[in-house]
């Protein structure tokens, strides 16, 4: 018998643009998306609907065909989500990339996702253009996403994204058969999965609507909600809520281009924000700022704070809880890209101080397996947690072998996380990760990717990368164990080699250790537990 989430709720089976725009559920002129740094910049439901229809017409005029993948490369902005919806409305597939990526990384992501179009922040075009050209994407299929007067298009020959708005309006791509909502892909976000390089994960209309339904509709709250959106929009931790739930709910949502503690705290206090989602490094930063008199009471309006993407210790959780109002809850959630974000949570107004990540969402199932893959599902039994349910994605795009190893014959996704379910409370607790993924400030770093870069160094014979935990920073960092080709190679040279080729969060901030040999088993697999 599998573990099952309590309760049940009907999940709409339709295309996601109709789900948002077929019917207005609140005042259509009220601002929904607002720029936290300049609240005069805002977008209402009516404006969003018009823009999405214009983008659908413009992208089709530009040659987009059903199933074409469009890469959006930018920091957060109130128009980011509009572009996401416009891409889907045109029949395309949205793909987001980290603004910190190098050309090397962008080249890989564009290639494996089979991107055909690019919309990029002008500040990042120097890295994006070579990557796009390397994947056969011509400049007439690249647009500059300039949203502020201070930004200028740094590269000539590129159209501004608003050129896509000059082709009139077109109805969005509707699904003739509602059941196609369960098979038609709308987003291709990246996950490290359980092993290897970042993998493109395909989300359907149904996956994303299910995520919203199980998180929000199944758990209504007795107060008017306002949100602050500070997590990166390209990331699966933010995408379902930021791009889809926001306009469905109509709750005022204040967008930060990127997380800035002063702006975050000022916005929460000034606009009486009631809900936010964070990751442990953000929690730690807020704690350090709230020790000053200026911000000591800035969080009093918050009623719901959820923390995920990495474990949070109980001491830090208690410290943050003490900054909130007595009726506020600060709880942990658990999920992953492959579960469309959240899989377990503790709904308001229940609190938790035990370190639990919550209970399964309604309609979700879980089982526990041992190291041999045998089902050992039982309360209070530790093993690898596997998930099944409406939010679990179809799989990785164009990677049949990865799908075969990640999903079993019964449709369960092997999370790689070790945990157990408390038999009395039905709360879940995670103990460790089976997978080798390193979590740096909420971002996932695949050791294989960093190892692959280092193996191209002419003076490195062998290498293994592991995560080391920094207790002060409350995050892991990558550390490289290196077998040198010659003894003249120094730590700073190795660090610089990685820094020039990978994003900042993938750098070797955990240091470099030189050793005589990398421990491996008979099949050649690195024995990282010995490092």
UniProtKB/Swiss-Prot annotation:
Q: Where is this region: AMP-binding?
A: 449-525
Organism whose genome encodes this protein? Aspergillus niger (strain ATCC 1015 / CBS 113.46 / FGSC A1144 / LSHB Ac4 / NCTC 3858a / NRRL 328 / USDA 3528.7)
EC number(s) on record? 6.2.1.-
- Protein name (record): Acyl-CoA ligase azaF
Q: What does this protein do?
A: Acyl-CoA ligase; part of the gene cluster that mediates the biosynthesis of azaphilones, a class of fungal metabolites characterized by a highly oxygenated pyrano-quinone bicyclic core and exhibiting a broad range of bioactivities. In the first step, the non-reducing polyketide synthase azaA forms the hexaketide precursor from successive condensations of five malonyl-CoA units, presumably with a simple acetyl-CoA starter unit. The reactive polyketide chain then undergoes a PT-mediated C2-C7 cyclization to afford the aromatic ring and is eventually released as an aldehyde through the R-domain.
Instruction: Report the Gene3D superfamilies cross-referenced here.
Output: 3.30.300.30, N-terminal domain of ligase-like (3.40.50.12780)
Which GO molecular function annotations are given, in alphabetical order? ATP binding; CoA-ligase activity
Family according to the record: Belongs to the ATP-dependent AMP-binding enzyme family.
Question: What's in the keyword line of the UniProt record?
Answer: ATP-binding, Ligase, Nucleotide-binding
Q: Name one Pfam family in it.
A: AMP-binding_C
Chain residues that bind AMP? 188-199
Which GO terms fall under biological process for this protein?
Answer: secondary metabolic process
Pathway assignment reads:
Secondary metabolite biosynthesis
Q: Which CDD domains match?
A: Firefly_Luc_like (cd05911)
Recorded name of the encoding gene = azaF
Entry annotated with the keyword Membrane = no
Induction or repression:
Expression is under the control of the azaphilone cluster-specific transcription factor azaR.
């Amino acid at each position: 018998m599998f573990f099952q989430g309590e309760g049940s709720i009907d999940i709409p089976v339709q295309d996601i643009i109709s789900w948002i725009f077929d019917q207005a559920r609140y005042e259509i002129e009220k601002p929904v998306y607002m720029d936290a740094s300049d609240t005069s910049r805002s977008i209402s439901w009516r404006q969003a609907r018009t823009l999405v229809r214009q983008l659908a017409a413009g992208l089709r005029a530009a040659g987009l065909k059903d199933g074409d993948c469009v890469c959006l490369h930018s920091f957060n902005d109130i128009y980011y989500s509009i572009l996401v919806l416009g891409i889907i409305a045109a029949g395309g597939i949205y793909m987001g990339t980290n603004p910190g990526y190098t050309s090397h990384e962008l080249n890989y992501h564009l290639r494996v996702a089979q991107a055909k179009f690019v919309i990029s922040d002008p500040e990042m075009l120097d890295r994006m253009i070579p990557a796009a050209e390397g994947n056969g994407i011509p400049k007439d299929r690249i647009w500059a996403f300039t949203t502020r007067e201070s930004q200028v298009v740094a590269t000539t020959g590129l159209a501004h994204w608003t050129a896509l708005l000059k082709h009139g309006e077109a109805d969005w791509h509707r699904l003739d058969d509602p059941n196609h909502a369960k098979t038609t892909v709308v987003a291709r976000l990246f996950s490290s999965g359980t092993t290897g390089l970042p993998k493109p994960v395909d989300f359907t209309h149904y996956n994303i609507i299910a995520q919203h339904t199980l998180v929000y509709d199944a758990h209504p709250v007795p107060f008017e909600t306002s949100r602050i959106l500070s997590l990166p929009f390209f990331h699966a931790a933010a995408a379902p809520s930021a791009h889809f739930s926001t306009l469905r709910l109509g709750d005022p949502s204040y967008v930060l281009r990127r997380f800035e503690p002063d702006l975050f705290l000022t916005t929460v206090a000034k606009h009486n924000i009631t809900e936010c989602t964070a990751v442990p490094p953000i929690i730690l930063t807020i704690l350090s700022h709230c020790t000053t008199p200026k911000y000591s009471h800035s969080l009093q309006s918050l009623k719901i704070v959820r923390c995920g993407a990495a474990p949070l210790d109980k001491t830090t959780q208690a410290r943050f809880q003490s900054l909130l109002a007595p009726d506020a809850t600060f709880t942990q959630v658990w999920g992953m890209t492959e579960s469309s974000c959240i899989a377990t949570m503790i709904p308001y107004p229940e609190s938790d101080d035990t370190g639990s990540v919550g209970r399964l969402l309604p309609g979700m199932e879980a089982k526990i397996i041992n190291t041999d893959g045998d089902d050992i599902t039982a309360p209070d039994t530790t093993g690898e947690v596997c998930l099944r349910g409406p939010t679990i994605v179809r799989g990785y795009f164009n990677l049949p072998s990865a799908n075969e190893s990640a999903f079993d014959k019964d449709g369960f996704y092997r999370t790689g996380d070790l945990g157990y379910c408390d038999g009395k409370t039905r709360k879940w607790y995670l103990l460790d990760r089976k997978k080798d993924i390193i979590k740096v400030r909420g971002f996932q770093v695949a050791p294989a990717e960093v190892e692959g870069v280092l193996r191209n160094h002419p003076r490195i014979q062998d290498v293994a990368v592991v995560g080391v935990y920094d207790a002060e920073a409350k995050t892991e960092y990558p550390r490289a164990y290196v077998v040198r080709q010659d003894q003249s190679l120094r730590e700073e040279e190795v660090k610089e080699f990685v820094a020039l080729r990978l994003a900042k969060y993938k750098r070797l901030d955990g240091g470099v250790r030189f050793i005589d040999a990398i421990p491996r088993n008979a099949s050649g697999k690195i024995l990282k537990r010995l490092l």
